[in-house]
Amino acid sequence: MTLIKIGKIVNTHGIKGELRLLSKFPYKDKVFINNMKIYIDKKDIEVINTYRKHKNFDMITLVGYNNINDVLKYKGLNVYVNKDDIMLDNNKYLDEDIIGSNVIYKGISVGEIKDIERYDKYSLLVILGKKEYLIPYNDNLVDKIDISNKKVYIKDIDGLFDI
């Protein structure tokens, strides 16, 4: 079983056991769903009862917990899901599947994806080659992703990389 981090419990909310999460996970609609099994601190297995957005936070309640005192123990802990439980649409990939991939530009390897930086409106691929490159992670620049061969093909846009 491979656990994927989807966020961190930063606080409680109210007195009925609601948890406030900070998450940059890109496919929240696939993990913050009723009856989704989550792993808190990679140990405690719980099940999501409800989910809602509140300001910049993701709010969840857990099955069997309806009091703040029952969930205080989870404050400050990371939340994970089993990778096999995430049902992504076609041509959607987890960051963990892309990180470490070789980047191909104009038929030449220009580096390896070291990280994906997620922001509210966009994401950046962090590519380490001759130097560090930051390029937008979107369909305008990424031509194809080959997960099985760990390769990401970038569209032929002049001046994007020093080759």
Language model regions located:
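Short Lys/Arg-rich amphipathic alpha-helical segments
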Residues: 1-163
